[in-house]
A protein has these predicted regions:
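N-terminal Rossmann-like NAD(P) cofactor-binding subdomain of oxidoreductases
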Residues: 1-139
């Protein structure tokens, strides 16, 4: 499995890397993307260094299976088609798609099955306050 992280140099991108390593997420390949300001930076993941590539409208996502995206709503909207056009599943952490009927809002503890219903190839999450609330309310 090939995994991409968009917004890799930001706080959430770094947290994605930490959690993927901590959980020993099964992947064969990792690719990091960022802005012009971040491109060229190097980050270590499981003992290997990875260089951040410039996010562009091209075919860099052709063989990507999952893209974790946390680069802001504008970037998510602008690059959604670029990321998903070859079949990658985009898991978006921004507010860009929270009102889009074709993008499921998924909180795994509550509605994990909705992640399978993704007509646009995108899964989004609700905002942090909503996530905490639905996790508590779900058993009721």
């Amino acid at each position: 499995m090939k995994v991409a992280i968009v917004g890799a140099s930001g706080a959430v991108g770094q947290e994605f890397l930490r959690i993927l390593a901590e959980r020993d997420f099964p992947m064969d390949e990792l690719v990091l993307f960022g802005s012009e300001r971040s491109a060229g930076r190097k980050y270590s993941f499981k003992g290997k260094d990875y260089e951040v590539r410039l996010l562009q409208h091209n075919d860099d996502f052709k063989d990507v299976d999952i893209a974790f995206v946390s680069a802001g709503g504008g970037t998510s909207k602008e690059y959604a088609d670029t990321i998903t056009k070859h079949g990658a599943v985009m898991i978006d952490n921004s507010s860009a798609f929270r009102m889009d009927d074709d993008v499921p809002l998924v909180v795994p503890e509550c509605n994990a099955e909705d992640a399978l219903k993704r007509p646009r190839g995108i899964i989004a999450n609700p905002n942090c306050t909503t996530i905490m609330m639905v996790v508590v309310l779900q058993p009721l």
